Each structure stands twice: as structure tokens, then as C-alpha cells.
């Protein structure tokens, strides 16, 4: 596989993590820039690890995962998105609270499609290591940039944009569901 193809796959896989980083960045303050780095590391690590797991797992697990993964991603993103909307509309303005558990859930939900990419690499007999490095680095960079973009925009519009961030998560979950589930 050529480098351009790897980069395009990496960018495609990183877009959900980028969008989530922007939405979570909306609630950040300058003193919380460590969150941007930690979340970028988490998203990058999971985007890199999932293709390896998919590559190792091969076809048998793909049948099960391909049926359940879109639903799991949708439900996780829906719950977190609704929580963000609720907190922005109902609760008084609060400081952003960093949650490793929430970050883990978001990292897993956004990297499920990377698992399928890994299975595809195995079926096509493509070496996994260089694509994984490219995918992980691109996701890290775009997630870090997304957090900073969200933080900058959030200061302009205040914390009410967290509702928009929640809506973005729900729409990402819906997109994952619609792209991967046949309703016929």
C-alpha cells in the first residue's frame, strides 16, 4: 500500500476523533490544555491499536463485530451527547471536569471502524505496522488540533456551545449506525 493511501485512510479514520475533540474542546479553558494532549494521545493510541486487533482477529470476529459495533458506537455516542446537551442547557455553568472513563468510551467508540480496516488489511495481506503508525500519528495530530480549535471557539461563544458538541456526537453516532447497518 502506498503512503498516500495510508494517509487518506488515516485522515478518514481520524475525522470522528477530530470532531469529538472540537466538541470537547468547546468546554476547555486555557488551564486545561493537558486534556487536549491526553485526549489526542488516547484517540491516537486507540486508532492505532484497533487496526492491529482487527488484523490479528481476521474474519471470524469480523462477522460478530460488524453486526454489533455500529450499534455500540451509536449508543455510546448518543449517551455522551445527550449528557453534554443536558449539562449545557439545564445545569449552571460549571468548570469542565476531565473524565478518563468518558475519554476511554469516546476513544473506543471512534476507533471501532479502525478495527474493520485492520481486518481488511489482513484479508488483503497488507503489512500492518506502517499504516498503524500513520493512522495513529494523524489521529493524534488532528485530535490535538481539534481540541485547540474547540477551546478557541468556545471562548468566543461561551460554554453554551457544549450543546452543539453533544449534538455533533449524536450525529457522528447516527452516521456510524447508518453507514454500517442495513435496515431492510
Curated annotation (Swiss-Prot):
- Taxonomic source organism: Methanothermobacter thermautotrophicus (strain ATCC 29096 / DSM 1053 / JCM 10044 / NBRC 100330 / Delta H)
User: Can you say where in the cell this protein is located?
Assistant: Cell membrane
Sequence similarity = Belongs to the MntP (TC 9.B.29) family.
A Gene Ontology term for the protein's cellular component: plasma membrane
Name of the gene encoding the protein in the UniProt record: mntP
Taxonomic lineage is: Archaea, Methanobacteriati, Methanobacteriota, Methanomada group, Methanobacteria
Query: Per UniProt, what is one GO molecular function of this protein?
Result: manganese ion transmembrane transporter activity
| InterPro entries per record | Mntp/YtaF (IPR003810), Put_MntP (IPR022929)
Task: Report the protein name in the record.
Answer: Putative manganese efflux pump MntP
Membrane topology per record: Multi-pass membrane protein
- What transmembrane ranges does the database entry give? 3-23, 36-56, 65-85, 103-123, 126-146, 163-183
Identify the HAMAP family for this entry: MntP_pump
- Alphabetically ordered keywords of this record: Cell membrane, Ion transport, Manganese, Membrane, Transmembrane, Transmembrane helix, Transport
Pfam families assigned to the protein according to its UniProt record, in alphabetical order: Mntp (PF02659)
Tell me the superkingdom of the source.
Answer: Archaea
